[in-house]
């Protein structure tokens, strides 16, 4: 529906809308960087300038976080009253042989704008550790996961190792081996036999609570 926008620009616009509906105010540029997987704030500023030029947003250069979503984007508005909100389960633990969404595993339900959620079988997982910091996924962040049991090379997955520990890593299949690659320059990849790894789902989004 955003025919004049790139994929990144759509992600940025939808993220801004979602933060306004969830928090009541727009995100900082650094938060946008993290949310859409960009490392450079100048790249985000470039996308924001394009969104403003096309009439999707209005910025106030004299104020931080001063981004207003304009009427043009409200064809797909997540801040409007008609926007569908869905509740995704926050899963406290993942255990082999037990359904992920078993009631005893669910800590709470978190509301999300439906337009930001890919797939139809999603859950939220709290990240522990710093193995994915280069991908913008930090300790105590929350990831949105599309429940699947297969993955393509380079996708970020939630995987169960030897039926015991769940981990978030980038997935690569190399012959009969699986490489679970951290996004941290100080950590080594995990190499496992195919039979030792169970794909739980694909990470499709990340968000954090600013304390």
Curated annotation (Swiss-Prot):
InterPro entries xrefs: ArsR-like_HTH, LexA, LexA-like, LexA/Signal_pep-like_sf, LexA_DNA-bd_dom, LexA_repressor, Peptidase_S24_LexA, Peptidase_S24_S26A/B/C
Keyword Glycoprotein: no
Keywords: Autocatalytic cleavage, DNA damage, DNA repair, DNA replication, DNA-binding, Hydrolase, Repressor, SOS response, Transcription, Transcription regulation
Catalytic activity, EC: 3.4.21.88
Annotated active site: 131 (for autocatalytic cleavage activity), 169 (for autocatalytic cleavage activity)
GO MF: DNA binding; serine-type endopeptidase activity
Leading EC class: hydrolase
GO BP: DNA repair; DNA replication; negative regulation of DNA-templated transcription; proteolysis; SOS response
DNA damage is among the record's keywords: yes
DNA-binding stretch(es), residue numbering of this chain: 29-49
Enzymatic reactions: Hydrolysis of Ala-|-Gly bond in repressor LexA
Marked site: Cleavage: 96-97
Family of the protein in this entry: Belongs to the peptidase S24 family.
Self-association and partners: Homodimer.
HAMAP family in alphabetical order: LexA
Function: Represses a number of genes involved in the response to DNA damage (SOS response), including recA and lexA. In the presence of single-stranded DNA, RecA interacts with LexA causing an autocatalytic cleavage which disrupts the DNA-binding part of LexA, leading to derepression of the SOS regulon and eventually DNA repair.
PANTHER family reported in the protein's UniProt record: LEXA REPRESSOR, LEXA REPRESSOR-RELATED
Name of the protein in question: LexA repressor
Organism whose genome encodes this protein: Clostridioides difficile (strain 630) (Peptoclostridium difficile)
């Amino acid at each position: 529906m955003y025919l004049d926008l790139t994929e990144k620009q759509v992600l940025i616009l939808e993220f801004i809308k979602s933060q306004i509906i969830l928090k009541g105010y727009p995100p900082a540029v650094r938060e946008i960087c993290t949310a859409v997987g960009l490392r450079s704030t100048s790249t985000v500023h470039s996308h924001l300038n394009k969104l403003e030029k096309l009439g999707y947003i209005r910025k106030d250069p004299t104020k931080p976080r001063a981004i207003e979503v304009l009427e043009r984007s409200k064809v797909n508005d997540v801040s409007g009253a008609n926007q569908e909100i869905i509740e995704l389960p926050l899963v406290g633990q993942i255990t082999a042989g037990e359904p992920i969404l078993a009631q005893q595993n669910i800590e709470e339900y978190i509301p999300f704008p439906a337009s930001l959620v890919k797939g139809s079988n999603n859950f939220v997982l709290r990240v522990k550790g710093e193995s994915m910091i280069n991908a913008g996924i930090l300790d105590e962040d929350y990831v949105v996961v599309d429940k699947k049991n297969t993955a393509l090379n380079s996708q970020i997955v939630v995987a169960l190792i030897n039926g015991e520990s769940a981990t978030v890593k980038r997935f690569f299949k190399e012959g009969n081996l699986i490489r679970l690659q951290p996004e941290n320059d100080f950590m080594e990849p995990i190499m496992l036999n195919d039979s030792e790894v169970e794909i739980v789902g694909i990470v499709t989004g990340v968000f954090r609570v600013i304390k």
